[in-house]
Swiss-Prot record:
Species classification: Bacteria, Pseudomonadati, Pseudomonadota, Gammaproteobacteria, Legionellales
PANTHER family cross-referenced by the UniProt entry: FE(2+)-TRAFFICKING PROTEIN-RELATED
Organism this protein belongs to: Legionella pneumophila subsp. pneumophila (strain Philadelphia 1 / ATCC 33152 / DSM 7513)
Family: Belongs to the Fe(2+)-trafficking protein family.
Name this polypeptide is given: Probable Fe(2+)-trafficking protein
Stated role: Could be a mediator in iron transactions between iron acquisition and iron-requiring processes, such as synthesis and/or repair of Fe-S clusters in biosynthetic enzymes.
NCBIfam families reported for this sequence: PRK05408.1 (NF003817)
Entry keyword set: Iron
GO molecular function ontology, one term from the record: iron ion binding
InterPro entries hit by this protein: Fe_traffick_prot_YggX, Fe_traffick_prot_YggX_sf
GO BP: cellular response to oxidative stress
GO cellular component: cytosol
Length: 89
């Protein structure tokens, strides 16, 4: 049986993640407050950020940027798309 959480992004009860996505306090918070659907939405947004900003995830500052954007996406004012970004349809 899957677990449910009150998702901070979707503002409703939804299926929760199966395991903590990464270690640490932020990982625990995501596990407890973010649904599987919202996590998948973040993964798509994160991929767009990596590609548009040409982030090199070997660099600590790129990983820190993504961590900050994730906090904004789920728990803050929201993560913005890069200026000039146009979605492919």
């Amino acid at each position: 049986m899957s677990r449910t959480v009150f998702c901070c992004k979707l503002k409703q009860e939804a299926e929760g993640l199966e395991k903590q996505p990464f270690p640490g306090e932020l990982g625990k918070k995501v596990f407890n407050e973010v649904s599987k659907q919202a996590w998948n939405m973040w993964l798509s947004h994160q991929t767009m950020l990596i590609n548009e900003y040409r982030l090199n995830l070997i660099e600590a500052r790129a990983r820190e940027f993504l961590k900050e954007e994730m906090q904004k996406y789920f728990f803050g004012e929201g993560s913005e798309k890069p200026s000039g970004y146009k979605e492919i349809k």
